[in-house]
C-alpha cells in the first residue's frame, strides 16, 4: 500500500480553520448537550446547544480531535447559527452520503476546505463528529 501525500490533506486553510475553534468555547449553561467519538481515531467532541423557535440560537464546542476533526467542527459551528434544526439534520445526512461515496459534496455547507479528507476513510469519523454530537443532543432533548 502506498502512502498518500500528507500535504494534500493538511492544507493551510484546514489548519487555519482548526485554530478558529477558540471562537466557539464550551457553553455548559446551555440546555442541550451531545457527544460523539470517532471509533477510528478516538477523536471526540462535546456540543452545547440552545434551540429557540426551531432554530439554533447558541452553541459551544469542546473538541479533542485531529486537524481534520477540528476543521470540520469549526465549519459546522460557523454554519449552524440561526439554522433550522431540520436543515442541520438534512445537511448531516448529506455529509454522511458524500463521505460514503453516494452523493456530491453538500452545497448547503462549504466543506471544500476539508474535501480532500474524503479520500481518507480513517478521517471520516472525525469529520462526522459535530453532526453526530448534534444528533445526540437532539436525542437527549427528547429522551
Q: Language-model segments: which ranges?
A:
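C-terminal binding/interaction regions
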Residues: 1-23, 83-143
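Intrinsically disordered, low-complexity segments enriched in small residues
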Residues: 7-11, 52-55, 62-63
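Functionally engaged cysteine thiol sites
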Residues: 41, 66, 126
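Structured beta-strand/loop patches that form or line metal/cofactor-binding pockets in enzymes
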Residues: 16-59
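Short, thiol/selenol-centered motifs that function as redox-active sites or metal-ligating centers
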Residues: 64-70
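Conserved short-loop catalytic and cofactor-binding motifs
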Residues: 60, 64, 118
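Alpha-helical support elements that line or immediately flank enzyme active sites
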Residues: 72-84
